[in-house]
A protein has these predicted regions:
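Nucleotide/phosphate-binding catalytic cleft detector across ATP-hydrolyzing
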Residues: 1-41, 47-166, 173-180
Length: 180
């Protein structure tokens, strides 16, 4: 392998969720259960570790990139503008939230997009509620994934989660309110 050719003594494969947990400072060899939810752009996984082993695991074959796609569709349907993936990601990071009540305090964001009606680029305002709709389903599925992993774990490990909580990793962990 390339690592051996480069002078490494040995090469080990490590689960990405385990690497994220160790990077977050968790001791996976300890008896207390730790739940790590890795929220990436391409996939979302939830892994319950104890004694250095996986006690329960689940994943969604998509990540928060799905929100980007939904933001693009929402902007086109509700505002009549086409935007690119990077603009949708910027809107998600600025206005996106996992908190359902956030639409009550609506925030506007100026964005440039291609006006479908006028066939030219224009600046328009995006409201929080448009992005909230794009986030809701994916957030609900993340909550369902976590519940499923906890439900499938041995009962004695559930008590540890009350003390230890859940560790969120990945770029999607920055979605406002996801840690609630």
């Amino acid at each position: 392998s390339a690592a051996i050719d480069a002078g490494a003594d040995s090469v080990s494969l490590v689960r990405s969720d385990a690497a994220a947990a160790v990077g977050a400072g968790l001791d996976l060899d300890a008896p207390e259960a730790k739940l790590v939810v890795d929220v990436g752009a391409g996939k979302i996984s939830a892994t319950l570790f104890t004694f250095g082993r996986v006690a329960a695991f689940g994943y969604l074959p998509y990540g928060l990139g799905r929100i980007d796609e939904r933001v693009q569709r929402s902007i086109q349907m509700n505002y009549g503008y086409r935007i690119g993936r990077s603009s949708a990601r910027e809107i998600k990071h600025t206005l996106g939230t996992a908190l359902p009540g956030a639409a009550a305090s609506d925030v506007l964001m100026h964005m440039t997009g291609f006006s479908i009606a006028d066939r030219i680029p224009k600046v328009f305002d995006v409201e929080t509620k448009s992005v909230l709709e794009a986030c809701e389903d994916v957030v609900r599925e993340i909550v369902g994934l976590v519940a499923s992993v906890v439900d499938n774990a041995p009962e004695e490990l559930s008590a540890d989660l009350t003390d230890m909580g859940i560790v969120l990793t990945g770029t999607g962990a920055e979605l406002t309110g996801l840690n609630k």
